[in-house]
């Protein structure tokens, strides 16, 4: 069979594996936390909590329109995550295969053994990622993270494909600098458009920009004649330039554009001028064959086009839907919505911090310090801060150790249970003495303890070292993606203690990058077997040894992960959130007011009222939102479904 067809068949089998797995385990209805709000908002295009996800809502609305009944709307919106996750697994396979074949040389000279190694690497890495704890968690519910990870993987695959096509095209053109005139650069425009659309899903996808920048640098600007010092100085310079471009997108375009509209006072005229300037720039730079400028104008234009999905927030808020978080129907409120002002400011590089002498954080008289980590003014958090001697200790122990490394090891070493605060484990006697292992009694509790004997971790670490030894440039690019989507997020979020839920789902981009190394690690093992047998055994023995070793690695890592994780990741019979919300609403008197407090006792109710039309006469009041003026005004002035406004005696000015 032609190798191209074998490639396609293998990729198709990986896709079918992921699709079948997620269809078998997808939630049949609403889940706890944000999915209730996501589904309700997608069904009638309402405004969910800041900074919103308008492009996700548009896709969710499309899927909901295909539902045969109101009761199946939730499953259809969940299906969006299923398809996005299956697509991500396919892309993971393709990326690993491309990375491995990069150092194997010209494909025309690739031996059968090398071909088997590259395909097996992709299968092992992709399947391992498909059954990893956090990614599988996102794959079966109506959440933005599955689609966001798909955008990340798609951008990574596209830039690697661009790199290969650009080198092939340059080789045909001969000597000289042709970069800005390459036909392959259309891939860069597509990537820019994907970044624009990803803004309307989740900003996490934008972090792949640094991977893109490094691949472009190593493909077009790196020179073998450079010394090590010269090369790293230029890498730092490229990093600084890419950081400047990144911040030009966020917050430059994302927040800066609405602020420009506000400053000018006429959004329509301002938008029209921007469109005309960009159109003229594209035309003139193309006419004058100004390659770099034309590429820049094209990329900026498609980013704006992708970002345009945010007009949905502004337009829909003006209709005052029942779910209208922050009421962003004016430019001023829209900017506040984008900047997440509802959640307060978090210092990044400089600000006040916890004073060990006074035992508190004093915002008024406290001295500003560099790299403040213990910054929360909540007195409950001070009781946690006092356990740490410094901000650095809190950063290393809690923010990195507890809020990232623990999640990382959940995915690639093992997880003690599904109880909040559960530790990581290995399952190896004598190595888990650090962990507080709860007694697990019920079947569901026992299913929640997953042990992998740290085999995925070891295989990924080996893959990282092997990758650096074979192709340090792309290995470094993967490392930057791994770091930025992991520790980089930790640095930026500057999280306070006592988080209301586990946040492992935020770091799936980092776990995706590590899964690439799991696949490469499998390829490294197979390559060592192949090298050992190349001159000493027949082709039949070589192939049998490669396939046998590959099968053992597959069973030991992704196979075992799948067996361990299936039980507690199977949501196919989980109706608890919907039943809970149904009981809450139906226990309320006619035209009653039902007070809730958090996400889990609010969002499933919103879903039932908005989508399934259950007890729309009940007014759900979220107490945690009552301290915001926009929510109090909505309760006072606006009806919600069949419930009347509340008789709030406070005047508009008092609110």
What is each stretch, according to the model?
Residues 77, 97-103, 135, 141-149, ...:
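ER/secretory pathway lumenal C-terminal domains and tails of membrane proteins involved
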Residues 1-13, 114-116, 183, 229-233:
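N-terminal membrane topogenic signal
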Residues 42-72, 82-83, 90, 433:
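Short hydrophobic/aromatic helix or loop-helix immediately within or flanking a transmembrane segment
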Residues 73-93, 102-105, 110, 114-121, ...:
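Transmembrane alpha-helical segments of multi-pass membrane glycosylation machinery
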Residues 18-29, 415:
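Alpha-helical transmembrane segments of multi-pass membrane proteins
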Residues 26-38, 48-60, 324-326, 400-401, ...:
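Extracytoplasmic catalytic/substrate-binding loops of multi-pass membrane glycan-assembly enzymes
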Residues 7-21, 123-127, 190, 236-244:
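Alpha-helical transmembrane segments
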């Amino acid at each position: 069979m032609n190798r191209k067809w074998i490639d396609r068949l293998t990729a198709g089998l990986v896709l079918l594996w992921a699709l079948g797995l997620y269809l078998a385990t997808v939630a049949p209805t609403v889940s706890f936390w944000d999915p209730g709000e996501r589904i309700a908002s997608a069904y009638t295009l309402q405004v969910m909590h800041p900074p919103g996800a308008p492009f996700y809502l548009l896709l969710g609305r499309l899927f909901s329109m295909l539902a045969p009944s109101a009761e199946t709307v939730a499953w259809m919106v969940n299906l969006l995550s299923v398809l996005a996750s299956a697509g991500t697994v396919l892309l993971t396979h393709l990326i690993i295969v491309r990375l491995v074949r990069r150092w194997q040389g010209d494909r025309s000279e690739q031996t059968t053994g090398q071909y088997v190694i590259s395909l097996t690497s992709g299968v092992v890495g992709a399947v391992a990622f498909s059954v990893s704890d956090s990614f599988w968690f996102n794959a079966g519910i109506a959440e933005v993270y599955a689609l966001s990870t798909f955008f990340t993987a798609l951008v990574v695959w596209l830039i690697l494909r661009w790199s290969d096509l650009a080198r092939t095209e340059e080789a045909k053109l001969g000597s000289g600098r042709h970069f800005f005139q390459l036909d392959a650069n259309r891939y860069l425009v597509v990537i820019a458009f994907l970044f624009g659309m990803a803004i309307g899903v989740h900003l996490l996808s934008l972090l792949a920009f640094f991977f893109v920048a490094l691949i472009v640098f190593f493909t077009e600007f790196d020179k073998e004649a450079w010394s090590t010092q010269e090369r790293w100085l230029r890498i730092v310079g490229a990093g600084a330039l890419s950081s400047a471009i990144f911040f030009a997108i966020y917050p430059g375009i994302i927040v800066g554009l609405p602020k420009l509209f506000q400053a000018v006072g006429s959004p329509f005229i301002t938008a029209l001028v921007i469109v005309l300037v960009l159109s003229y720039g594209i035309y003139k730079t193309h006419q004058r064959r100004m390659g770099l400028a034309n590429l820049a104008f094209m990329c900026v234009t498609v980013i704006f086009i992708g970002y345009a999905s945010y007009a949905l927030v502004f337009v829909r808020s003006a209709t005052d839907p029942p779910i209208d978080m922050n009421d962003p129907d004016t430019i001023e409120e829209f900017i506040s919505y984008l900047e997440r002002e509802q959640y307060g400011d978090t210092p990044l590089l400089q600000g006040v911090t916890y004073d060990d002498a006074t035992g508190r954080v004093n915002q008024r008289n406290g001295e500003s310090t560099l790299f403040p980590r213990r910054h929360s003014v909540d007195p409950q958090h001070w009781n946690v801060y006092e356990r740490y001697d410094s901000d650095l200790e809190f950063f290393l122990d809690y923010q990195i150790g507890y809020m990232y490394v623990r999640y990382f090891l959940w995915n690639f070493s093992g997880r003690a249970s599904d109880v909040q605060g559960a530790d990581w484990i290995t399952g190896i006697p004598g190595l888990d003495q650090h962990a507080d292992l709860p007694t697990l009694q019920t079947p569901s509790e026992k299913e929640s303890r997953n042990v992998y004997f740290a085999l995925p971790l070891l295989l990924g670490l080996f893959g990282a070292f092997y990758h650096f030894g074979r192709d340090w440039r792309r290995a470094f690019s993967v490392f930057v993606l791994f770091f930025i989507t992991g520790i980089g997020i930790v640095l930026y979020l500057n999280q306070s203690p006592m988080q209301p839920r586990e946040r492992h789902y935020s770091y799936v981009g980092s776990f995706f990058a590590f899964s690439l190394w799991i696949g490469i690690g499998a390829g490294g093992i197979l390559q060592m077997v192949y090298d050992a047998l190349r001159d000493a055994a027949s082709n039949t023995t070589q192939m049998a040894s490669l396939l046998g070793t590959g099968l053992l690695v597959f069973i030991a890592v992704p196979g075992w992960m799948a067996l361990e994780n299936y039980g507690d990741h199977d949501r196919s019979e989980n109706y608890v959130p919907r039943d809970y919300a149904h009981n809450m609403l139906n226990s309320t008197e006619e035209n009653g007011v039902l007070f809730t407090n958090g996400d889990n006792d609010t969002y499933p109710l919103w879903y039932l009222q908005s989508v399934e039309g259950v007890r729309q006469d009940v007014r759900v009041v979220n107490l945690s939102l009552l301290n915001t003026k926009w929510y109090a005004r909505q309760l006072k002035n606006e009806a919600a479904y069949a419930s009347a406004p509340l008789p709030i005696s406070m005047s508009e000015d008092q609110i």
